[in-house]
Amino acid sequence: MVKVCDSIMGAGKSSAAITYINEHPGEKFIYITPYLDEAARIKKGCPGARFIEPSDKLKQYQFKKYLHTAALIADGRNIATTHQAFKSYTPDMLDDIRTQGYTLIIDENVDVLENYDIPEDDLQLAIDAGYIKEENGTYSIVNHDYHGKALHDLFWMLRSRELIRIDDKSQTLFYWVLPQELILSFKDVYILTYLFEGQSIHHFLEIYDIPYEFVNIAHDSEGAFRFCDGEGYTPEYVTHLKDMIHVMDNQKLNAVGDGKYDLSMAWFENNPAGVEQLRKNIYNCYRNIWGDVAVDKRMWGSYKSAFQKLRGKGYWNSFLPFNTKATNEFKERSHLVYPVNIFMNVGDKMFYHKHGIEVDEDMYALSVMVQWIWRSCIREGHEIYIYIPSRRTRELLLHWIDSFDKINPLAA
């Protein structure tokens, strides 16, 4: 059964998972997380479970992490690993997972779609050579006996996933898609996340009609966190978000993003004058408005393709891509600039629409932004100051903050 714990940051999701693991010593677990620091925390918090992180430094497994992973699964060992490694599990590994009766714990959203850049001619060569087949826009491997280099990455990925083609009006896109067996092979699955409905793992479950139920977090009198079916614990800080997140209200600086699609990826590509004005605004913000703030307290994030267009003196090396959710390296940063206006890319939307899923782009944008903001010092309980030039993005954050006005924190 898939159980979704959709709770705000700091509600105790990871702590509840640790409690669950420690209270079920007879079960076997695979815990996946965006970053290795969290894997280390799970190992430390569950000493009796003896979690192992698969390694690519072991000679007996040919210095390949996936071979070490396969051996650990076959032995029924508890594993802590990253999202990226998890997405490469092969059918043989999934067979062993079913046999062993593993429980899966997914910490944060897993991207179920990944764009893959490959010429159609290369795919056709592989088809003509009898290595792969194509049916209704889906490519899968039929002959594993390929030892070349030119298509090594393609064959490596086809071991664990299917490649799909999505035809747009002006281009053809290719995507790797997670197989539903990656979820269905486990006895139980816990998904620890926030703003679940805006995330790809939610759409994935809907597409494949995989049933799920919600669980909450209970916080007992001794300070322990546990999964529960009743009303959940809400951390006390949420009632003070208005006092913790200071959103810049500067009409002159905000004017650059008044339009609904201003600061979208397309806007950056087609509006050089606007981009230059935005760069000047960011410089003004850090040079004059926040001029006394140390460089190591600054953090700004946009599309990677916009970095060179927006970089400037005093903040260029404080860049963190807008969709980062897997780092604690910026937890001392207090003065933020978020010059983006996120919309789901065309290929993703076409894939979901093809499967009857209508995505909520506002929820998607909010979930990405909140994860980025929580890379800063607010995760440590400190106040932050943030400049969000896009009106749409800024209002999404303000409405989200307002939504906590009527919430009463629960301690149990």
Show the residue positions of the predicted features.
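Walker A/P-loop
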Residues: 1-18
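Conserved Walker A/P-loop ATP-binding site and its immediately adjacent core
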Residues: 16-57, 84-85
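Conserved RecA-like ASCE P-loop NTPase motor core of nucleic-acid helicases/translocases
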Residues: 27-38, 189-193, 289, 297-304, ...
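Inter-Walker segment of RecA-like/P-loop motor cores
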Residues: 48-89, 303
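Short basic/glycine-enriched coil/helix segment immediately N-terminal to the Walker B
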Residues: 72-76, 90-102, 184, 295, ...
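SF2 helicase catalytic motif II
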Residues: 84-86, 94-140, 148-165
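Conserved RecA-like P-loop NTPase helicase motor core
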Residues: 84-89, 112, 314-396, 403, ...
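Conserved helicase/translocase motor-coupling segment
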Residues: 178, 187-188, 194-326, 345, ...
